[in-house]
């Protein structure tokens, strides 16, 4: 038998295709207080960035909840988070704030426009909603609108109106959702969302058959606001194109975009 009398190097080949990477498969659940997000229902969260996006960044009263959830996400990638249902309220465009805990709460109590809080409400309870502003612009106000450059062209007549022979309906709107005070982005009046060429008509459709009624489009696509009622300046909003004369022209914003700043949202992290 031979021996090495001085230090040496032993070479060994390893087939890396046989190595199984470590992948976390743990599923966790956590309920706590957060600044934003749906209340009372489980939401899947896969990372700390995802947690912040869906439930907001921590403040001085909910930081324990936030960092407890974040600690799990350092080692796992499937956490079901439930925002505890507290007395927090949603910011609204006018009147007294209301509580819209989640999408089911909205559908059951507010979808038909029975909120009496103006045209818009924050998607979820919390003071973050107080930084939201919604602007709605029809064709008559587009040329002077501060956010006109965010869209390819002025709103006009929808394809549904054209197909029904209401060729001058001017039923379309452009909508922007803004971070008015900078609470979301750190910069005041940052654009958070845009909705282009949506219609005031309840029966307006896209070419693929989906609704192009502005209420439906915003409710389905916005991460920040719910539709609550038609603004008083949009007197024709919600009517059906199929019931109109071919000469019908929708009453838009009167030459100036309609702006709604939300307020009244409150936090409540006690649960």
What role is predicted for each listed range?
Residues 1-271:
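Surface-exposed assembly/interface segments
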């Amino acid at each position: 038998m031979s021996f090495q009398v001085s230090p040496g190097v032993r070479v060994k080949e390893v087939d890396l295709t046989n190595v199984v990477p470590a992948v976390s498969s743990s599923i966790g659940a956590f309920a706590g207080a957060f600044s934003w997000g749906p209340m009372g229902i489980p939401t899947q969260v896969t990372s700390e960035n995802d947690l912040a996006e869906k439930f907001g960044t921590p403040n001085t009263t909910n930081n324990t909840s936030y960092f407890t959830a974040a600690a799990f996400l350092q080692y796992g990638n499937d956490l079901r988070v439930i925002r505890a249902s507290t007395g927090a309220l949603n910011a609204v465009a006018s009147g007294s704030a209301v509580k819209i805990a989640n999408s089911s709460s909205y559908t059951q109590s507010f979808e038909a426009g029975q909120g009496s809080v103006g045209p818009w409400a924050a998607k979820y309870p919390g003071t973050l909603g107080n930084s939201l502003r919604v602007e709605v612009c029809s064709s008559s106000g587009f040329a002077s609108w501060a956010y006109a450059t965010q869209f390819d062209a002025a709103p006009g007549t929808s394809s549904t109106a054209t197909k029904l022979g209401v060729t001058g309906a001017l039923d379309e709107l452009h909508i922007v959702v803004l971070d008015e005070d900078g609470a979301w982005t750190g910069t005041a009046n940052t654009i958070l969302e845009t909705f282009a060429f949506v219609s005031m008509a309840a029966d307006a459709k896209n070419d693929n058959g989906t609704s192009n009624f502005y209420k439906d489009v915003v409710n389905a696509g916005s991460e920040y606001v719910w539709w609550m009622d038609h603004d008083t300046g949009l007197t024709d909003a919600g009517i059906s194109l199929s019931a109109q004369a071919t000469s019908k022209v929708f009453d838009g914003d009167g030459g100036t975009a309609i702006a709604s700043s939300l307020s009244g949202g409150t936090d409540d992290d006690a649960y």
